[in-house]
């Protein structure tokens, strides 16, 4: 089984996204507005992401489609590294994970720096963005040259992102935190059984 590295270097190890060999299904994207806001209601409170399509058009379109479809509703903040990033984007519904698993996006050019508060897709190398994203909890400009293209930023409630549960630590093979392969396959049941303290998205919605 091949594993997908989201960020090729970190303060405390690599960020991973599993990548099993499964056929992709129809995942056509809707053209997003030039600017739009997404409100995340979470177990720690609310935060708002403002997306600017010009920063990363393909990434902005994908995020718009995922939010509108309810993909992020119930998604755990399964990897929290205080002072670096918080990562999410594995759906609670295994069928949704299967649908989007191999729906890779062509890379957008990096037009903005990965400063604190920006939101960016993880990658497994060139042209491999799917659903997993991370919020930069610090100024991570060193990621810019690695191809990580921010498509938006947290404009309200950044203090909420700083508070997500972090004690489970790194996932395998570096630690005992959530295993992304199992999380994709089992969804919410896996997190509730083995990692019940993780914070999660109650509802993500496009603001009118």
Where are each of the predicted segments found?
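N-terminal export leaders
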Residues: 3-8
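Hydrophobic helical h-region of N-terminal Sec-dependent signal peptides
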Residues: 10-16
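Cyclophilin-like peptidyl-prolyl cis-trans isomerases
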Residues: 16-208
